[in-house]
Amino acid sequence: MRTAPRSQLNRAIAPCRKRGPRRVAMVSMHTSPLEQPGTGDAGGMNVYVLQTARRLADRGVAVEIFTRATSSEQPPALSPSEGITVHYVPAGPFEGLSKGDLPSQLCAFTNGVLRAEAAQPPGYFDVIHSHYWLSGQAAWLAAERWGVPHIHSAHTLAKVKNLHLAAEDTPEPFTRVVGEEQVVAESDALVTNTSSEAEVLVDLYRADPDKVTVTPPGVDPEVFTPGDKLAARRRLGLPDDALVLGFAGRIQPLKAPDVLVRAVARLRALNPELAPRLRLVVVGGPSGNGADNPRWLHDLAAELGIADAVTFLKPRAGHELAEVFRACDVVGVPSYNETFGLVALEAQACGTPVVAAAVGGLTTAVADGHSGLLIRGHDETDWANALDKLVTDAPRRARLAAGALDHAARFTWSHTADDLLGAYGDAIQRRAVSPRRSPASKR
């Protein structure tokens, strides 16, 4: 394992020159960007792909997204908005395949991507941008076939996940580690959300620092905005005077919603006067190991004697999710690891402070002491104490709420798209100056 000098990393994460292509192929094999985040395999990556595609299209760049078909009702292709096409590529049965089974369908999926491009005039795509390692494997071959640069965004990394496993979680397989190492080595450019993710790619995956660009994600300012807290609570059936904590995400061990449930139970024991007013709102659906027992979090709340204080809501789209954030006094993000933690940013854009685990990208998404609090570890008592200090101190919450708005305003999808255009343009120029050899010629 090689650690790059800090000067090399600083050059690698410098802002890119703003140039770009005419048409971009994006690959999101395992999940469609049109799926509802918060359940199954849909999450922040889905939001990232769709939002960046929209902003690129606004800048006159055509974006075509390739994802695996999961239903016979899906058309071969559709256009969710002007300048964007989503292709549903048949690869294996529509049902019965988990994300862990999808490596067996890489050949079929890649073939579908290549066939779609072959029906177009030569030089149809200028760049291919893959999201997640499975997509990276498919895009690697497509980029070589088309003679275009391959830009890769990992979103999550096996080596990092395995370093931060929840007790009930399953380690990522060695095959994924190998696949990620290959994609990192063969990509023309690597886009990361934070400088810490860039360092991980260099330190753990031996990425070339000169290929790494930091491009933070954004938040939609037309959706996630401050609003009437009392009106939001009444629409959700929450008491006006409640102290409301929120969680939004997939219900799985990695996201650690159980930490919040246990912390609420502990807080009620530490401060009995708060018990009648405390509420926890959980937005999300089962995923990963959590899908084996979809009601495990309900069962935990009942076991701890706080079922009456926890409201479970199904995953919901942007405007409805924003309303939940507005209803909350504090939003918790206790994940064992996050490449960024988009939910934290969206909550802050609604003027709600965030208490988050001090891991991964959450240390960038949350400004500790300014827009929220970062907690080291996942001990329920530590979380209960931190929450107690916030819910019982309205002036401090108000200061953090103002800081949350200030911090979130620094992250926009427009900035993300501009940075991506720069990364694409630089990769196009590098390949034009020094065309890459095929993998076969390297051996």
Swiss-Prot record:
Sites where the protein binds UDP-N-acetyl-alpha-D-glucosamine: Q36, P37, G44, R250, K255, R316, E338, E346
Chain sites annotated for binding 1D-myo-inositol 3-phosphate: H30, D41, A42, G43, G44, M45, N46, K99, Y132, T156, R176
Keyword entries, A-Z: Glycosyltransferase, Magnesium, Metal-binding, Transferase
Reactions catalysed: 1D-myo-inositol 3-phosphate + UDP-N-acetyl-alpha-D-glucosamine = 1D-myo-inositol 2-acetamido-2-deoxy-alpha-D-glucopyranoside 3-phosphate + UDP + H(+)
Protein name, UniProt field: D-inositol 3-phosphate glycosyltransferase
Subunit relationships: Homodimer.
InterPro entries reported for this sequence: Glyco_trans_1, Glyco_trans_4-like_N, Glycosyltransferase_grp1, Mycothiol_biosynthesis_MshA
Species of the source: Stackebrandtia nassauensis (strain DSM 44728 / CIP 108903 / NRRL B-16338 / NBRC 102104 / LLR-40K-21)
Lineage of source species: Bacteria, Bacillati, Actinomycetota, Actinomycetes, Glycomycetales
Domain of life: Bacteria
PANTHER family: SULFOQUINOVOSYL TRANSFERASE SQD2
